């Protein structure tokens, strides 16, 4: 069972920047890393006119595209899948880094905060699954450890320790 750790926070808090830097650090250390990202707005990996797009437009509910070094599966679903359903799709990995899903998922989470966004509510005070805060400033009354948002190696150490 891979170690699963979430990076949660509000928009523009630096979640993607920190999580990708931690992914790079863990990969450098030899871990096999996977990532799951929550997109609040619709997204599309296809481009109009491309073959995979044409299959989807023709009604295919699942399309796999393969090249020499990667593959991707596009799935149309009537309902949004749960985070647990998505996590179950990963295989052959040591660590799964999850971005978003602050109100979903039975996994430990690191809140990402920046001074520029300090007016946002503190998730670490509202969610028991938040086990650390990665930030660029100190806050009073923090109930969990504070990690330096600009030190991905230290955040990676924390992830490994969980």
Q: Which residue ranges define each predicted feature?
A:
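Walker A (P-loop) ATP-phosphate-binding motif of ABC ATPase nucleotide-binding domains
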Residues: 4
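Hydrophobic anchor at the beta1->P-loop junction of P-loop NTPases
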Residues: 7
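Walker A (P-loop) phosphate-binding loop of P-loop NTPases
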Residues: 12
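Conserved lysine of the Walker
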Residues: 15
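N-terminal phosphate/diphosphate-binding loop that engages ATP/GTP or pyrophosphate donors
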Residues: 21-84
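Phosphate-binding/switch loop-helix module in NTP-utilizing enzymes
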Residues: 74-104
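Phosphate/Mg2+-binding loops and adjacent switch elements
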Residues: 95-162
């Amino acid at each position: 069972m891979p170690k699963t750790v979430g990076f949660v926070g509000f928009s523009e808090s630096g979640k993607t920047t920190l999580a990708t830097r931690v992914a790079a650090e863990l990969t450098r250390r030899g871990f096999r890393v996977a990532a799951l990202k929550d997109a609040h707005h619709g997204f599309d990996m296809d481009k109009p006119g491309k073959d995979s797009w044409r299959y989807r437009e023709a009604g295919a509910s699942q399309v796999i595209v393969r090249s020499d070094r990667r593959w991707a599966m596009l799935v149309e679903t009537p309902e949004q899948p749960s985070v647990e359903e998505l996590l179950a799709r990963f295989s052959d990995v040591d660590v799964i880094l999850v971005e978003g899903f602050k109100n979903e998922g039975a996994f430990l989470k690191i809140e990402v905060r920046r001074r520029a966004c300090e007016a946002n509510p503190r998730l670490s005070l509202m969610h028991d699954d938040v086990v650390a805060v990665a930030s660029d400033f100190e806050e009073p009354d923090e109930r969990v450890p504070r990690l330096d948002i600009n030190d991905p190696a230290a955040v990676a150490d924390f992830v490994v320790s969980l």
